[in-house]
Amino acid sequence: MKTFIFLALLGATVAFPIDDDDKIVGGYTCSRNSVPYQVSLNSGYHFCGGSLINSQWVVSAAHCYKSRIQVRLGEYNIAVSEGGEQFINAAKIIRHPRYNANTIDNDIMLIKLSSPATLNSRVSAIALPKSCPAAGTQCLISGWGNTQSIGQNYPDVLQCLKAPILSDSVCRNAYPGQISSNMMCLGYMEGGKDSCQGDSGGPVVCNGELQGVVSWGAGCAQKGKPGVSPKVCKYVSWIQQTIAAN
């Protein structure tokens, strides 16, 4: 999950966006069909993840925006055709109107599929949250992002990571002045486990509900620098209203 990479150079902290997706570091290979709501956003290559929330709509991160996107559903090994995948072009791509590319606030986006997906054991929707999650809640993060905190290793097979939501105070202390009321941190303060480049836009699912979207962080799996996600619970009304209007 990293739209931002923070580098400490000569005592200065520099933040800049990167055109890469987030990945899973320190996780494990997901079992086949265990994350049926996970989608791959493709523009000739996998560049971000997303979550199917009904047969025709996907939630992803606003920083994953491209003018043309093919949504790939039912994927497990993205390097080969395994049968059962569904490739559907995006008909509409709608970033949150208050998305801020500098602060990465409101980093959420909706994608309307040009035709409804066929729902089955490989492709199914994840529920939107009924309420916001408590600190300590365990969540599942998944994606095809980088699996190394230093260097690169992009897996073909979907990777998973279980990680807890951290308290707001821990989150704000990790990123002073950068955490809005719309954001939450999750992961491990000791480092070693995180999302990373290539996982951006992908799901953070807690107790069967989509509570987060892989968004940003300082590097990947670095000590004291957990992953940051928008709180999907803050956007349920916007999601429902946008779907109804489109």
Curated annotation (Swiss-Prot):
Keyword Disulfide bond: yes
Peptidase S1 domain residues: 24-244
GO MF term list: metal ion binding; serine-type endopeptidase activity
Main localization of the protein described in the UniProt heading: secreted
Cofactor: binding comment: Binds 1 Ca(2+) ion per subunit.
GO biological process, one term: proteolysis
Active site: H63 (charge relay system), D107 (charge relay system), S200 (charge relay system)
Disulfide bond entries: C30-C160, C48-C64, C132-C233, C139-C206, C171-C185, C196-C220
UniProt KW Hydrolase keyword: yes
Gene3D superfamilies: Trypsin-like serine proteases (2.40.10.10)
Propeptide residues according to the Swiss-Prot or TrEMBL record: 16-23
Catalytic function, reaction form: Preferential cleavage: Arg-|-Xaa, Lys-|-Xaa
InterPro entries named in the record: Peptidase_S1_PA (IPR009003), Peptidase_S1_PA_chymotrypsin (IPR043504), Peptidase_S1A (IPR001314), Serine_Proteases_S1 (IPR050127), Trypsin_dom (IPR001254), TRYPSIN_HIS (IPR018114), TRYPSIN_SER (IPR033116)
Pfam family for this entry, one: Trypsin
Enzyme class per UniProt: hydrolase
Subunit text: Interacts with SERPINA1.
Family: Belongs to the peptidase S1 family.
Protein name: Serine protease 1
Lineage: Eukaryota, Metazoa, Chordata, Craniata, Vertebrata
